[in-house]
Amino acid sequence: MTYNEFAMDVLELIEECPKDWRSGQSIFNIVDSKYGIARDVQFIDGIDCFYDDNQIDAFLNSAYKRLKNE
């Protein structure tokens, strides 16, 4: 899977999340439920898009790197 495929896979699922969630919250929860690596990105890599939407790109990049290294 390429980075673009991964990102599109995550971004397409945002519409299924509750409407009152911010984008970062949605992305975090999608990555956590589908791939199980969101908390590693948040706590080990120190990139937290759940509380800071400005970190979405960095979060997705770090999550993708973790998937590629599995």
Language-model segments: what does each one mean?
Residues 1-70:
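C-terminal alpha-helical interaction appendages
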